[in-house]
Curated annotation (Swiss-Prot):
Highest taxon listed in the record's lineage: Eukaryota
Region spans: Disordered: 95-176
Gene of this entry: hmx3a
Native source species: Oryzias latipes
Similarity remark: Belongs to the HMX homeobox family.
Main location: nucleus
Phylogenetic classification of the source organism: Eukaryota, Metazoa, Chordata, Craniata, Vertebrata
Compositionally biased tracts (Basic and acidic residues): 112-126, 153-171
Described function: Transcription factor involved in specification of neuronal cell types and which is required for inner ear and hypothalamus development. Binds to the 5'-CAAGTG-3' core sequence.
Protein name: Homeobox protein HMX3-A
Presence of keyword DNA-binding: yes
Alphabetical list of PROSITE patterns matching this protein: HOMEOBOX_1, HOMEOBOX_2
Cysteines joined through disulfide linkages: none
Matches recorded under CDD domains: homeodomain
Amino acid sequence: MPETTQETCAPAKDSPFFIKNLLNCDSKPSKPRPVLAATKAALEGGFSLSQVGEFNFPRFELPAQRFSLPAHYLERTSAWWYPYTLSSGAHLHRTEVTERPGARDSSPTSGTDRDSPDLVLKTEPDAKEDEDDDEHNNNKSSDEIILEESDAEETKKEELEEWKKRDEDKKPCRKKKTRTVFSRSQVFQLESTFDMKRYLSSSERAGLAASLHLTETQVKIWFQNRRNKWKRQLAAELEAANLSHAAAQRIVRVPILYHENSASEGGAAAANVPVSQPLLTFPHPSVYYSHPIVTSVPLLRPV
Protein backbone atom coordinates (compact mmCIF):
# COMPACT_ATOMS: atom_id res chain seq x y z
CA MET A 1 0.00 0.00 0.00
CA PRO A 2 2.68 2.63 0.78
CA GLU A 3 4.45 1.83 -2.51
CA THR A 4 1.32 2.55 -4.53
CA THR A 5 0.77 5.84 -2.71
CA GLN A 6 4.29 6.91 -3.45
CA GLU A 7 3.86 6.18 -7.11
CA THR A 8 0.65 8.17 -7.33
CA CYS A 9 2.29 11.12 -5.62
CA ALA A 10 5.21 11.08 -8.04
CA PRO A 11 5.41 13.90 -10.54
CA ALA A 12 3.54 13.65 -13.82
CA LYS A 13 6.73 13.43 -15.82
CA ASP A 14 7.56 9.98 -14.42
CA SER A 15 4.01 8.61 -15.09
CA PRO A 16 4.09 5.55 -17.33
CA PHE A 17 0.65 6.28 -18.81
CA PHE A 18 1.81 8.88 -21.31
CA ILE A 19 1.31 8.05 -24.97
CA LYS A 20 5.01 8.51 -25.48
CA ASN A 21 5.89 5.88 -22.94
CA LEU A 22 3.12 3.51 -24.12
CA LEU A 23 4.10 3.57 -27.77
CA ASN A 24 7.84 3.96 -27.11
CA CYS A 25 8.16 6.27 -30.07
CA ASP A 26 11.54 7.84 -30.86
CA SER A 27 11.80 11.57 -31.28
CA LYS A 28 13.67 11.18 -34.54
CA PRO A 29 11.54 9.90 -37.41
CA SER A 30 12.90 6.73 -38.89
CA LYS A 31 13.54 6.45 -42.57
CA PRO A 32 10.74 4.75 -44.49
CA ARG A 33 11.75 1.34 -45.69
CA PRO A 34 10.71 0.04 -49.07
CA VAL A 35 7.37 -1.68 -48.67
CA LEU A 36 6.68 -2.49 -52.34
CA ALA A 37 8.82 -5.60 -52.35
CA ALA A 38 7.15 -6.89 -49.23
CA THR A 39 3.66 -6.24 -50.61
CA LYS A 40 4.51 -7.95 -53.90
CA ALA A 41 5.84 -10.99 -52.12
CA ALA A 42 2.79 -11.04 -49.89
CA LEU A 43 0.46 -10.96 -52.90
CA GLU A 44 2.40 -13.60 -54.78
CA GLY A 45 3.08 -16.25 -52.15
CA GLY A 46 1.53 -15.08 -48.93
CA PHE A 47 3.21 -13.63 -45.84
CA SER A 48 6.42 -15.16 -44.50
CA LEU A 49 8.29 -14.61 -41.29
CA SER A 50 11.15 -12.73 -42.93
CA GLN A 51 8.79 -10.36 -44.74
CA VAL A 52 6.80 -9.69 -41.62
CA GLY A 53 10.02 -8.83 -39.84
CA GLU A 54 10.69 -5.99 -42.25
CA PHE A 55 7.53 -4.14 -41.17
CA ASN A 56 8.04 -1.77 -38.27
CA PHE A 57 5.17 -2.25 -35.87
CA PRO A 58 5.11 -0.26 -32.64
CA ARG A 59 5.39 -2.24 -29.47
CA PHE A 60 2.72 -1.90 -26.86
CA GLU A 61 4.47 -2.19 -23.52
CA LEU A 62 2.74 -2.16 -20.16
CA PRO A 63 4.42 -1.83 -16.77
CA ALA A 64 5.01 -5.09 -14.97
CA GLN A 65 4.26 -3.67 -11.56
CA ARG A 66 0.89 -2.30 -12.64
CA PHE A 67 -0.53 -5.68 -13.60
CA SER A 68 1.75 -7.73 -11.34
CA LEU A 69 3.02 -9.74 -14.36
CA PRO A 70 6.58 -10.92 -14.86
CA ALA A 71 8.82 -8.80 -17.05
CA HIS A 72 9.87 -11.63 -19.37
CA TYR A 73 6.18 -12.28 -20.22
CA LEU A 74 5.54 -8.66 -21.07
CA GLU A 75 8.62 -8.52 -23.29
CA ARG A 76 6.90 -10.98 -25.64
CA THR A 77 3.69 -8.97 -25.85
CA SER A 78 4.39 -8.12 -29.46
CA ALA A 79 4.32 -11.79 -30.37
CA TRP A 80 0.90 -12.62 -28.94
CA TRP A 81 -0.57 -9.17 -29.57
CA TYR A 82 0.01 -9.39 -33.34
CA PRO A 83 -1.26 -12.77 -34.56
CA TYR A 84 0.74 -12.75 -37.80
CA THR A 85 4.04 -12.76 -35.88
CA LEU A 86 3.43 -16.19 -34.38
CA SER A 87 5.42 -19.30 -35.08
CA SER A 88 5.93 -20.72 -38.54
CA GLY A 89 3.63 -23.69 -37.81
CA ALA A 90 0.64 -21.46 -37.32
CA HIS A 91 1.54 -19.54 -40.45
CA LEU A 92 1.80 -22.70 -42.48
CA HIS A 93 -1.49 -23.91 -41.07
CA ARG A 94 -3.20 -20.75 -42.20
CA THR A 95 -1.69 -20.91 -45.66
CA GLU A 96 -2.91 -24.47 -46.04
CA VAL A 97 -6.38 -23.42 -44.96
CA THR A 98 -6.33 -20.58 -47.45
CA GLU A 99 -5.07 -22.82 -50.21
CA ARG A 100 -7.94 -25.28 -49.84
CA PRO A 101 -10.70 -22.90 -50.91
CA GLY A 102 -8.48 -21.90 -53.80
CA ALA A 103 -8.39 -25.51 -54.91
CA ARG A 104 -12.13 -25.58 -54.61
CA ASP A 105 -12.38 -22.46 -56.72
CA SER A 106 -10.14 -24.04 -59.34
CA SER A 107 -12.67 -26.87 -59.74
CA PRO A 108 -14.60 -27.03 -63.07
CA THR A 109 -17.75 -25.86 -61.29
CA SER A 110 -16.32 -22.35 -60.68
CA GLY A 111 -18.22 -19.29 -61.83
CA THR A 112 -15.68 -18.33 -64.50
CA ASP A 113 -15.68 -21.82 -65.96
CA ARG A 114 -19.45 -21.92 -65.92
CA ASP A 115 -19.62 -18.68 -67.81
CA SER A 116 -17.15 -19.86 -70.46
CA PRO A 117 -18.67 -20.40 -73.97
CA ASP A 118 -17.00 -23.81 -74.30
CA LEU A 119 -18.92 -25.19 -71.37
CA VAL A 120 -22.12 -23.59 -72.62
CA LEU A 121 -21.63 -25.28 -75.98
CA LYS A 122 -20.92 -28.54 -74.22
CA THR A 123 -24.00 -28.31 -72.03
CA GLU A 124 -26.32 -27.49 -74.94
CA PRO A 125 -25.70 -30.82 -76.78
CA ASP A 126 -26.12 -32.60 -73.46
CA ALA A 127 -29.48 -30.91 -72.96
CA LYS A 128 -30.44 -31.80 -76.52
CA GLU A 129 -29.44 -35.40 -75.95
CA ASP A 130 -31.51 -35.46 -72.77
CA GLU A 131 -34.50 -34.03 -74.64
CA ASP A 132 -34.03 -36.60 -77.41
CA ASP A 133 -33.89 -39.36 -74.83
CA ASP A 134 -37.07 -38.06 -73.19
CA GLU A 135 -38.85 -37.86 -76.55
CA HIS A 136 -37.63 -41.35 -77.40
CA ASN A 137 -38.91 -42.62 -74.08
CA ASN A 138 -42.23 -40.87 -74.61
CA ASN A 139 -42.51 -42.33 -78.10
CA LYS A 140 -41.69 -45.72 -76.73
CA SER A 141 -44.28 -45.37 -74.03
CA SER A 142 -46.97 -44.30 -76.53
CA ASP A 143 -46.05 -47.15 -78.88
CA GLU A 144 -46.16 -49.58 -76.02
CA ILE A 145 -49.57 -48.26 -74.98
CA ILE A 146 -50.87 -48.62 -78.55
CA LEU A 147 -49.47 -52.13 -78.77
CA GLU A 148 -51.10 -53.05 -75.48
CA GLU A 149 -54.46 -51.69 -76.66
CA SER A 150 -54.16 -53.53 -79.98
CA ASP A 151 -53.24 -56.73 -78.15
CA ALA A 152 -56.27 -56.36 -75.91
CA GLU A 153 -58.53 -55.80 -78.93
CA GLU A 154 -57.06 -58.81 -80.71
CA THR A 155 -57.63 -61.01 -77.68
CA LYS A 156 -61.24 -59.81 -77.48
CA LYS A 157 -61.76 -60.57 -81.17
CA GLU A 158 -60.26 -64.02 -80.76
CA GLU A 159 -62.52 -64.72 -77.79
CA LEU A 160 -65.58 -63.63 -79.77
CA GLU A 161 -64.58 -65.84 -82.69
CA GLU A 162 -64.15 -68.79 -80.34
CA TRP A 163 -67.59 -68.18 -78.84
CA LYS A 164 -69.11 -67.98 -82.32
CA LYS A 165 -67.44 -71.23 -83.31
CA ARG A 166 -68.76 -72.91 -80.19
CA ASP A 167 -72.28 -71.66 -80.90
CA GLU A 168 -72.05 -72.92 -84.46
CA ASP A 169 -70.88 -76.29 -83.23
CA LYS A 170 -73.79 -76.47 -80.82
CA LYS A 171 -76.36 -75.61 -83.48
CA PRO A 172 -77.36 -78.46 -85.83
CA CYS A 173 -75.85 -78.09 -89.25
CA ARG A 174 -78.62 -77.53 -91.77
CA LYS A 175 -77.84 -78.73 -95.24
CA LYS A 176 -79.03 -76.73 -98.18
CA LYS A 177 -81.95 -78.29 -99.97
CA THR A 178 -81.21 -79.49 -103.47
CA ARG A 179 -83.93 -78.42 -105.87
CA THR A 180 -84.73 -80.86 -108.67
CA VAL A 181 -85.60 -79.51 -112.08
CA PHE A 182 -88.40 -81.44 -113.85
CA SER A 183 -88.88 -81.58 -117.57
CA ARG A 184 -92.12 -80.62 -119.31
CA SER A 185 -93.13 -84.24 -120.02
CA GLN A 186 -92.54 -85.18 -116.38
CA VAL A 187 -94.58 -82.22 -115.14
CA PHE A 188 -97.43 -83.03 -117.56
CA GLN A 189 -97.61 -86.68 -116.45
CA LEU A 190 -97.46 -85.71 -112.78
CA GLU A 191 -100.23 -83.13 -113.25
CA SER A 192 -102.45 -85.66 -115.02
CA THR A 193 -102.00 -88.22 -112.24
CA PHE A 194 -102.68 -85.53 -109.64
CA ASP A 195 -105.95 -84.60 -111.34
CA MET A 196 -107.02 -88.22 -111.10
CA LYS A 197 -105.77 -88.90 -107.57
CA ARG A 198 -104.65 -86.47 -104.94
CA TYR A 199 -102.90 -89.12 -102.86
CA LEU A 200 -100.84 -92.05 -104.15
CA SER A 201 -100.13 -95.37 -102.52
CA SER A 202 -96.61 -96.69 -102.17
CA SER A 203 -96.98 -99.04 -105.15
CA GLU A 204 -98.43 -96.30 -107.37
CA ARG A 205 -95.68 -93.91 -106.32
CA ALA A 206 -93.00 -96.50 -107.10
CA GLY A 207 -94.49 -97.24 -110.56
CA LEU A 208 -94.77 -93.53 -111.41
CA ALA A 209 -91.19 -92.87 -110.29
CA ALA A 210 -89.92 -95.75 -112.43
CA SER A 211 -91.83 -94.52 -115.49
CA LEU A 212 -90.54 -90.94 -115.08
CA HIS A 213 -86.97 -91.99 -114.16
CA LEU A 214 -87.25 -90.28 -110.76
CA THR A 215 -86.85 -91.40 -107.19
CA GLU A 216 -89.80 -92.10 -104.92
CA THR A 217 -88.79 -89.23 -102.60
CA GLN A 218 -88.84 -86.77 -105.49
CA VAL A 219 -92.34 -87.91 -106.52
CA LYS A 220 -93.49 -87.78 -102.91
CA ILE A 221 -92.16 -84.23 -102.41
CA TRP A 222 -93.71 -83.07 -105.68
CA PHE A 223 -97.15 -84.37 -104.66
CA GLN A 224 -96.82 -82.74 -101.23
CA ASN A 225 -96.00 -79.37 -102.77
CA ARG A 226 -98.81 -79.78 -105.31
CA ARG A 227 -101.35 -80.56 -102.60
CA ASN A 228 -100.28 -77.49 -100.61
CA LYS A 229 -100.68 -75.36 -103.71
CA TRP A 230 -104.10 -76.88 -104.40
CA LYS A 231 -105.22 -76.14 -100.83
CA ARG A 232 -104.09 -72.54 -101.15
CA GLN A 233 -106.07 -72.22 -104.39
CA LEU A 234 -109.20 -73.63 -102.75
CA ALA A 235 -108.84 -71.24 -99.83
CA ALA A 236 -108.50 -68.29 -102.20
CA GLU A 237 -111.62 -69.37 -104.15
CA LEU A 238 -113.64 -69.74 -100.97
CA GLU A 239 -112.57 -66.31 -99.79
CA ALA A 240 -113.61 -64.80 -103.13
CA ALA A 241 -117.04 -66.53 -102.93
CA ASN A 242 -117.59 -65.31 -99.40
CA LEU A 243 -116.74 -61.77 -100.39
CA SER A 244 -119.19 -61.83 -103.30
CA HIS A 245 -121.95 -63.25 -101.07
CA ALA A 246 -121.36 -60.56 -98.47
CA ALA A 247 -121.52 -57.87 -101.17
CA ALA A 248 -124.86 -59.33 -102.43
CA GLN A 249 -126.32 -59.23 -98.94
CA ARG A 250 -125.42 -55.60 -98.57
CA ILE A 251 -127.70 -54.62 -101.52
CA VAL A 252 -130.92 -52.97 -100.17
CA ARG A 253 -134.06 -54.23 -101.91
CA VAL A 254 -136.62 -51.45 -102.36
CA PRO A 255 -140.26 -52.75 -102.71
CA ILE A 256 -142.19 -51.78 -105.90
CA LEU A 257 -145.00 -49.36 -105.01
CA TYR A 258 -146.80 -49.06 -108.39
CA HIS A 259 -147.50 -51.59 -111.14
CA GLU A 260 -149.32 -50.73 -114.42
CA ASN A 261 -151.41 -53.91 -114.57
CA SER A 262 -152.63 -53.57 -111.01
CA ALA A 263 -153.56 -49.90 -111.63
CA SER A 264 -155.72 -50.73 -114.70
CA GLU A 265 -157.46 -53.57 -112.89
CA GLY A 266 -158.14 -51.34 -109.93
CA GLY A 267 -159.72 -48.67 -112.19
CA ALA A 268 -162.21 -51.17 -113.71
CA ALA A 269 -163.26 -52.46 -110.30
CA ALA A 270 -163.82 -48.91 -109.11
CA ALA A 271 -166.15 -48.21 -112.07
CA ASN A 272 -168.36 -51.18 -111.21
CA VAL A 273 -168.45 -50.65 -107.43
CA PRO A 274 -170.16 -47.43 -106.16
CA VAL A 275 -167.83 -45.18 -104.31
CA SER A 276 -168.93 -43.93 -100.96
CA GLN A 277 -169.13 -40.19 -100.64
CA PRO A 278 -166.85 -38.88 -98.02
CA LEU A 279 -168.00 -36.20 -95.69
CA LEU A 280 -166.31 -32.86 -95.55
CA THR A 281 -165.84 -32.04 -91.95
CA PHE A 282 -165.49 -28.60 -90.55
CA PRO A 283 -164.38 -27.49 -87.17
CA HIS A 284 -167.92 -26.57 -86.15
CA PRO A 285 -169.69 -29.80 -85.11
CA SER A 286 -173.32 -28.78 -86.00
CA VAL A 287 -172.72 -28.04 -89.69
CA TYR A 288 -172.21 -30.88 -92.16
CA TYR A 289 -172.16 -30.58 -95.92
CA SER A 290 -172.48 -33.49 -98.23
CA HIS A 291 -170.83 -33.25 -101.62
CA PRO A 292 -170.64 -36.07 -104.13
CA ILE A 293 -167.17 -36.73 -105.65
CA VAL A 294 -167.28 -37.51 -109.36
CA THR A 295 -164.04 -38.93 -110.69
CA SER A 296 -164.97 -39.95 -114.21
CA VAL A 297 -167.12 -36.97 -115.25
CA PRO A 298 -165.37 -33.63 -115.41
CA LEU A 299 -166.93 -30.66 -113.79
CA LEU A 300 -168.75 -28.15 -116.07
CA ARG A 301 -167.94 -24.58 -115.47
CA PRO A 302 -170.28 -21.75 -116.59
CA VAL A 303 -168.98 -19.59 -119.37
